[in-house]
């Protein structure tokens, strides 16, 4: 998943409407009104250098390694493979991405090493994303104790949507068509909307243990926060794609030669940067932190503890 430019806010102090005399002026017979304070505009910018934040992503490495070790122990003790194996894939890839942050658009990297390149990162991310969304969909089916057909259908829609999103993100990388990233993220919006609807219905209509009902509450809470955020993300991706393509610019025809060239480009081209705009600004920083190093790993591990060991 991807994000774009930083946000900059301004706070203006309030003031009255009366005019004031300049400090240096010609004498006047009528006199001057009392001077009013000059107007001040305070700028509160987003940090332009993300270097400290990118280093802080390393804190996600021991977190994911710990979760991986605990999950592997649960699996060795006979835990549910449909819950635990997807989690193990996710934890290992998330630790990797905390070590070697990458942004596909522009092949932006923090560490100038082949391990940060877009192609290997995307291959690993494909397995990770499909795995953990499959786990989330399996959770819905496990908690659908009344076997409601349309709830199961929504859970499988999540798997289909993440598969379609993989198609679009790979197409964006291999054809350099930035607009395709929008459709990738639209797939994520659809699958989490399905997860939120299914979780809400099950929570309202199904009698579950507190721990299992808590999983539905987590899904609902995430959906209420993520879906509005994703709307902003989609808008920013759309605007960014338009800003990088002029109206008269025709995309290069999609040929095997184009795909091969962009694959080689994604494997070998790296652009080291710590500029906030290159990493997607506030949206990009929020996404990386929550996805690899905090919220999603914690959520997936909680699923493992509740359903993977019973």
Regions found by a protein language model. Give the residues of each.
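Hydrophobic transmembrane alpha-helical segments in integral membrane proteins
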Residues: 41-63
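Short aromatic-rich membrane-water interface segments that cap or initiate transmembrane helices
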Residues: 47, 114-127
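C-terminal transmembrane-bundle signature of multipass membrane proteins
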Residues: 58-67, 198-310
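Internal transmembrane alpha-helix with an interfacial aromatic "cap," most often the third helix
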Residues: 64-73, 98-105, 122-155, 163-174, ...
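Membrane-interfacial loop-to-transmembrane alpha-helix junctions, especially the N-terminal start
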Residues: 76-89, 146-159, 209-218
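Aromatic-anchored segments of alpha-helical transmembrane domains
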Residues: 90-96, 159-171, 223-229
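Helix-loop junctions on the outward
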Residues: 94-120
């Amino acid at each position: 998943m991807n994000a774009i430019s930083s946000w900059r806010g301004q706070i203006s102090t309030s003031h009255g409407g009366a005019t004031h005399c300049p400090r240096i002026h010609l004498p006047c017979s009528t006199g001057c009104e009392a001077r009013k304070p000059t107007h001040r505009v305070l700028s509160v910018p987003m940090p332009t250098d993300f270097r400290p934040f990118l280093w802080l992503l390393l804190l996600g490495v021991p977190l994911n390694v710990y979760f991986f070790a605990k999950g592997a122990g649960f699996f060795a003790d006979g835990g549910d493979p449909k819950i635990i194996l997807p989690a193990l894939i996710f934890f290992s890839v998330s630790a990797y991405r905390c070590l070697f942050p990458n942004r596909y658009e522009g092949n932006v990297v923090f560490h100038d090493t082949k391990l940060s390149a877009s192609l290997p990162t995307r291959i690993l991310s494909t397995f990770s994303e499909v795995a953990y969304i499959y786990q989330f969909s399996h959770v819905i089916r496990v908690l659908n104790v009344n076997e409601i057909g349309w709830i199961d259908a929504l859970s499988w829609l999540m798997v289909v949507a993440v598969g379609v999103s993989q198609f679009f993100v790979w197409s964006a990388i291999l054809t350099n068509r930035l607009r395709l990233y929008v459709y990738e993220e639209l797939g994520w919006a659809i699958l989490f909307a399905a997860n939120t609807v299914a979780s809400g219905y099950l929570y309202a209509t199904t009698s579950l243990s507190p721990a299992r009902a808590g999983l539905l509450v987590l899904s609902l809470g995430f959906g209420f926060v993520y879906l509005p955020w994703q709307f902003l993300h989609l808008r920013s991706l759309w605007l960014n794609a338009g800003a990088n393509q002029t109206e008269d610019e025709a995309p290069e025809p999609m040929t095997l030669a184009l795909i091969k060239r962009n694959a080689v480009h994604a494997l070998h081209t790296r652009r080291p940067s710590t500029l906030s705009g290159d990493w997607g600004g506030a949206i990009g920083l929020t996404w990386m932190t929550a996805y690899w190093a905090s919220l999603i790993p914690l959520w997936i591990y909680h699923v493992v503890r509740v359903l993977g060991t019973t």
